[in-house]
Amino acid sequence: MAGSLPPCVVDCGTGYTKLGYAGNTEPQFIIPSCIAIRESAKVVDQAQRRVLRGVDDLDFFIGDEAIDKPTYATKWPIRHGIIEDWDLMERFMEQVVFKYLRAEPEDHYFLMTEPPLNTPENREYLAEIMFESFNVPGLYIAVQAVLALAASWTSRQVGERTLTGIVIDSGDGVTHVIPVAEGYVIGSCIKHIPIAGRDITYFIQQLLREREVGIPPEQSLETAKAIKEKYCYICPDIVKEFAKYDVDPRKWIKQYTGINAINQKKFVIDVGYERFLGPEIFFHPEFANPDFMESISDVVDEVIQNCPIDVRRPLYKNVVLSGGSTMFRDFGRRLQRDLKRVVDARLRLSEELSGGRIKPKPVEVQVVTHHMQRYAVWFGGSMLASTPEFFQVCHTKKDYEEYGPSICRHNPVFGVMS
């Protein structure tokens, strides 16, 4: 039975969880990764929470329903891509499987995703939840970066498909730059950038707060988020962009209309410089975070330079974007331009230092944008879980019962795929 039904693919992120069945091109559900629980007191430690079993166990909501429950305590079990509260995560998965996917977990193999640098203990916890609580027949825990690389195959011919590339995975809570060679993540070279979708939302909120007085305070964050998703883009040159707005404001300044949740009145705000200043913090992080000064193009270059010398050219040639925060218009174009500048400057310098005797071969820089970018990780998982090899690399319930959760510490790479 388990082999005949499609596997379930679940990609849990900091902000949103993407879930659906393998073989589909996009997830069936995209829900906020939050859970609303009834708590007698707001601050209850985990030990006490376990005592509140019974009826309270079933009295919780996840996703959009959780956000709409003001009388419940809303928790976000995942922070910066890593699961922090496993009790809540188990309950979250309970509704994901039964209420959203409406699946019988005993009949479906599961593909779950994990962030780079996830600890082996976390894999064990996840295996325990899936095998013990849900009794799944098989589980595979895939690294998000490898799935994002596989998802980028939609944009190239079959002969050019490769599992070597550098993945820029930027979601709501964390941005990682991850080099992958032949399907193996080069763990020692991964860099983490403390700027992601949520930081852009906070930055836009701050810019609006200084200028727009009409926004109801309790709605300022969701207003900033809506503006970010609707109007923001990446500009090629920030000084010229300011000038453009000053010369012809009516062409560039947009209006956002919101509705006050309390008295249902409309409020209108002008959206000006925020449109390009918000996402600009990827390239000038010092605008929002004085502790971090390195632009995303410099980080990518540094990561590739830390990698073994024989994979550097293929990495420059395959920079793959993944995640919702890379969806800003012209993000790929700007990144490719900045990265090319850094690389060309280095080649020129080496030529000068050799006194013109060495002519370095130019390095091809290519940033891959594709139409599956936003749900790249989920779509990559859906592709890989619909191949026949998937069932061979899964850890099975039988293995789990024989050896214990430690089997999930290592998940074989799809070697046959590349």
From Swiss-Prot:
Plays a role in the organization of the actin cytoskeleton. May function as ATP-binding component of the Arp2/3 complex which is involved in regulation of actin polymerization and together with an activating nucleation-promoting factor (NPF) mediates the formation of branched actin networks. May decrease the metastatic potential of tumors. It is found in: Cytoplasm, Cytoskeleton; Cell projection. The keyword NAD does not apply. Detected in fetal brain. Detected throughout the adult brain, in neurons from gray matter, but not in white matter. Detected in liver, skeletal muscle and pancreas. Detected in lung adenocarcinoma cells with low metastatic potential, but not in lung adenocarcinoma cells with high metastatic potential. PROSITE patterns: ACTINS_ACT_LIKE. Pfam families: Actin. GO terms for cellular component: cell projection; cytoplasm; cytoskeleton; extracellular exosome. GO terms for molecular function: actin binding; ATP binding. Interacts with the Arp2/3 complex composed of ARP2, ARP3, ARPC1B, ARPC1B/p41-ARC, ARPC2/p34-ARC, ARPC3/p21-ARC, ARPC4/p20-ARC and ARPC5/p16-ARC. Belongs to the actin family. ARP3 subfamily. This is Actin-related protein 3B. InterPro entries: Actin, Actin/actin-like_CS, ATPase_NBD.
